[in-house]
């Protein structure tokens, strides 16, 4: 299996939203929680361990960083029931069952403390700057959510949900024949979100796990009830599920993956276009909009333009945060013993492979 990619955090209208806690509680046999500040090589450490596990033929799930999707915040080793994850802010993790299930891997030992203190003023200024940019981004995302809410209300009022329920029941009757071999477990992970590179979605992960794809064309949360129904039906049939929340509104679902069936239901729209060839398309936006008046449609076009403008502003703020964070990491780099970090990564690789 090729590695696949998810997110466990999202930049949402609620601020940073974390799903990292689901890794705790003894769920994994070995959860390594990395501790260390900026620039100490946490992402490189995880990438090195993940690459070694791939070479050993292990199945690896990588967790992208919501602040920088080119960086890693975790790696899960399915065949070992083990994982390594960045446990620092904004997704702080503390062991539930220390050492027996979860344990710290401390990278702060590789800092030259005196060298870092010599750059104290620079480090403080850059830390405060990137945090301020994040606060700005979250204010803008909240505003975007308020604007979007008006459009959603108008579209929900026109949606024939009873018709959608009947269609959902028909799809599930065809697709979920027989029972699964799992326990009906639900793992939650984001497929993407708003980042400094704009809005992204890892549809490549969907295609790697589930070749049979139902594309739900929906920009207003019209499909949330349908997706919840899919989850419940799959659980009842003992299929394990990956439920992917909407990164803008994490209390709602955006995608559901049922890998054992090779079946996925994904949400796609102008902000997150799916360029592949789905098995079926469900045009929920069209179902709602066909009943709108000309004046209502004009208002929706206006709100979409406002949303797009606010999204651009949020991405700009996240880009500014990324620049400040890069500068902060560069300030720390001369203070880090990277040979020591690499040696520790190799020890953890050897320990994992001996399990």
PLM region spans:
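N-terminal pre-Walker A segment at the start of P-loop NTPase domains
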Residues: 1-23, 162, 166-204
